Amino acid sequence: MAPPCSISSASHLLITASLPKPSLRPPRLPHPKPLPAALLALAAAAPTLPALADVPAPPPSPTQDVQVLEAPSPAANPFSNALLTAPKPTSSAAADLPEGAQWRYSEFLSAVKKGKVERVRFSKDGGLLQLTAIDGRRATVVVPNDPDLIDILATNGVDISVAEGDAAGPGGFLAFVGNLLFPFLAFAGLFFLFRRAQGGPGAGPGGLGGPMDFGRSKSKFQEVPETGVTFVDVAGADQAKLELQEVVDFLKNPDKYTALGAKIPKGCLLVGPPGTGKTLLARAVAGEAGVPFFSCAASEFVELFVGVGASRVRDLFEKAKAKAPCIVFIDEIDAVGRQRGAGLGGGNDEREQTINQLLTEMDGFAGNSGVIVLAATNRPDVLDAALLRPGRFDRQVTVDRPDVAGRVKILEVHSRGKALAKDVDFEKIARRTPGFTGADLQNLMNEAAILAARRDLKEISKDEISDALERIIAGPEKKNAVVSEEKRRLVAYHEAGHALVGALMPEYDPVAKISIIPRGQAGGLTFFAPSEERLESGLYSRSYLENQMAVALGGRVAEEVIFGQENVTTGASNDFMQVSRVARQMVERFGFSKKIGQVAIGGPGGNPFLGQQMSSQKDYSMATADVVDAEVRELVEKAYSRATQIITTHIDILHKLAQLLMEKETVDGEEFMSLFIDGQAELFVA
């Protein structure tokens, strides 16, 4: 009979059975079952080799027979995972312990309560522990914040110890490194960003342009300005050009002025409505002067952080002084140059710090020798008085809207490169565009070119320019609008009423065009050609204002006369607003009321953030307010009666004009005036 086989010898037989050497084949066992099944059973029942080394299995009984190690199922594959299957311990006490070198905390507590953990060893920080089970195996457990853990371990007789170092594993060291790594990286990042802001080592190419360049000026610098604009390209601002040409000549020929004791102007402020060419003049100065040129917008000074505005002003003038003589151009200076001292809000106003620094740089203790400051604004009334005094801005150049001659020159400049028809007359266009700025005229010619291209024309004719003018003034035509015949008739009589009253009012603006084509929010329009002299002077007589109110009410009067009181519409709402505004100004501001007298009441309120009053204050009593309302109503009623008298007297001309409008939709001034030849109309005499 073959000698009994122990578990350890069986494990040896399992290992040798998988080798290809025939000399190591295990001896045949006297068992009726096949050998591979018995070996598979041994592999499933034998513990792992490390466990056998730590806890040696007890020697088998002398009477132990190898048949007790048979596989439970003879159908099992004898070669399935023969080498990869880890042998399991045979001890019943460790049979339900978790596998692996790291246990979950719940598995650890379950094993402790079952008495299967012999000892634990905590790491120094208490975040990990290493356990030793009763079968000798070891595992690690991540320990949460459980205040009852020590009591549970002591109750179940577990030996507790604490490691002197990070004996529990690499987790403690990694945690230590992680705690130091984030502050180090944050500090290094901030250091790198501030080095970039200062332009020092690590600032990158050029040292500037980093994301932390808060305190540096963002002005554009040109050593040799190439703006592409000279004084030849600036038209319609002859007086402004003369003022600036002296500044340019001073830079080019300083000896001519210094020989007579003259000093170069330190600053020049360009003042004028939007679109009059202030920035264009500055570009022309840069193109003519031939000296270094700095340009920036005032809104670039004040941004996100407090103190940035003053810092950027200092940086700008430091660069300019290094390049002196030079020109610094600040566009829209009212963004930082507004009046100080409003004192609202109780906080610090960053704009005040910026303007204080600007005042110091322009004419402070150190001075700004060789730096000429050009600035542009369309709000000179809100600028601080200290900024406007001589020594800072020695000159204030007014760039006003061009007159007829100026508009002709501007149209000639903006028509360069455009194919124009022979019927285009710049003189007529200029007279039809009173009050237009250079930007408006440039837009007019561009819109005319777009219309000509849309119509597949080779040239720009006067029709395209006329249509573009109406588009700019009143909006695009509503070609697809569906208008009933009754509405067209009502609009025709409404516009005819405006034109008829305007034509028969003495010393009023002539009618230029009448149209019932819907444009924008208007169903029809009547164009008048205002006097050039009146626009330039800004002086309006009392009779002109009274005529203006009567003309505005002519549309409503025509509706009432033709369609009756019950069928008038809301089309005159804008006319009423205009009439009320003119009448109230005549009473409150212009002194055209006998009862109120030669006084101005109810002045406009100022903006508190400009250092002015909070709101308008009524400086008159309620009784005076009643008198003002009565005077306004009297002026409006007088204008209404004048318009009614004209329309009822010349109703035949009203019918002819309305019929002509319904047929042609558009009637020009000359065609309209031809109706008066047969009508024998006379001017209205009050």
From Swiss-Prot:
Cofactor requirement: Zn(2+)
GO cellular component: chloroplast thylakoid membrane
Record-listed Zn(2+) binding positions: H494, H498, D575
Protein's GO biological process: cell division; proteolysis
A Pfam cross-reference name: Peptidase_M41
Protein localization: Plastid, Chloroplast thylakoid membrane
Signal sequence residues: none
Cofactor note: Binds 1 zinc ion per subunit.
Keyword terms of this UniProt record: ATP-binding, Cell cycle, Cell division, Chloroplast, Hydrolase, Membrane, Metal-binding, Metalloprotease, Nucleotide-binding, Plastid, Protease, Thylakoid, Transit peptide, Transmembrane, Transmembrane helix, Zinc
Binding-site positions, ATP: G272, P273, P274, G275, T276, G277, K278, T279
Transit peptide: 1-16
Membrane topology: Single-pass membrane protein
EC number: 3.4.24.-
InterPro entries the UniProt entry points to: AAA+_ATPase, AAA_lid_3, ATPase_AAA_core, ATPase_AAA_CS, FtsH, P-loop_NTPase, Peptidase_M41, Peptidase_M41-like
Transmembrane segments: 173-193
Active-site residues, record numbering mapped to chain: E495
GO terms of molecular function: ATP binding; ATP hydrolysis activity; ATP-dependent peptidase activity; metal ion binding; metalloendopeptidase activity
Domain of life: Eukaryota
Function field: Probable ATP-dependent zinc metallopeptidase.
Similarity comment: family membership: In the N-terminal section; belongs to the AAA ATPase family.
Name recorded for this polypeptide: ATP-dependent zinc metalloprotease FTSH 1, chloroplastic
Primary gene name: FTSH1
